[in-house]
Amino acid sequence: MKDGINEKAESLIDTDFLIELRRNAYIECTENYLSTNTVAGIFGDGLPEELFYACGVTPVPIEGVDAHIFKFAKENEAAGFCDVIKSTLIYLITQKCPILYSCKMYVLQNTCTRFIAALKANTEKTVYVYTDEGELVRTLCALYGTQYDETLRQNAKADLDYIKNVLTKIKYYSDVSAQEFFLLEFYSKYMTDLDKRRKYFERLEENIAFKKERLKVAEVSALCPRGNYKSVCAEIHSPLTRIIRVWKGADYGYAHCMFEYKKETGY
């Protein structure tokens, strides 16, 4: 195995490597905090990530993804929230998550208003709700003391588009498992070096034996699935199933979630 590619194994995708990326991000974000202090926490998949790189800022997902932290909460702390918000808040309040701690600001997609309100109520850092590209650029440059670079934006956009295209190719033209594809899509974002992330996907594209014809793929929808994907995968019986993130009418959701869902899961 090299750089997350199992060249001689049954599957090329090393899921342990992908899961470990989040732990690696702890170290990378801490090192960044101690040097340039240019990490921004993000929540939501609809943010124009290329603009962060254009402003010299590294975007990293911030939601808590496990229940381990719950035991460190004070009585009734974060009660009444879904597991996603509860995990994130307890990590934030106890300062036990290096990613959350290292962020100079948090940028959130305007979707879950409960997440937005909870974060604002528990941090003195800037919590910015994304509205448009121009305002995001101005906010990033002002807070981080950087300048917008159009060349950096174009390069980052090219890398992100390439990765998105490879993911689409893997989704419809390979027989990777539901869990493998989910981790590729959602956990590769913890690879904070965008150049290394692109090279990883280049190696995947070179080594995966793609099918000639598009496969018939089923989709299972989930709310904020980084934390409950194992529970969702346990109920998936077809390898040609992909977990997608939605905000309304999801197949799987959490207790206390503000959005509608069909079946409850948890951390």
Residue ranges and their predicted role:
Residues K2-V39, C141-Y252:
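A charged, amphipathic alpha-helical module
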Residues N24-N32, F43-L47, L89-K96, R114, ...:
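Short alpha-helical segments and helix-capping/turn motifs at coil-helix boundaries
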Residues T38-G44, P61, M105-Q109, V217-E219:
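Short, hydrophobic beta-strand segments that form beta-sheet elements in well-ordered domains
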Residues D45-G46, L51-V65, F70-A73, A218-Y267:
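Redox- and metal-dependent alpha/beta enzyme cores, enriched for Fe-S-associated oxidoreductases
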Residues G56-P61, N76-A79, T123-Y128, E135-R138, ...:
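Active-site regions of enzymes building and remodeling cell-envelope glycoconjugates
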Residues D66-S102, E260-Y261, T265-Y267:
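Glycine-rich, anion-gripping cofactor-binding loops and their flanking helix/strand elements
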Residues S87-A142:
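Acidic/His-rich segments in extracytoplasmic proteins that coordinate ligands and/or metal ions
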Residues L89-V107, E150-V166, G266-Y267:
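Extended, charge-rich low-complexity interaction segments
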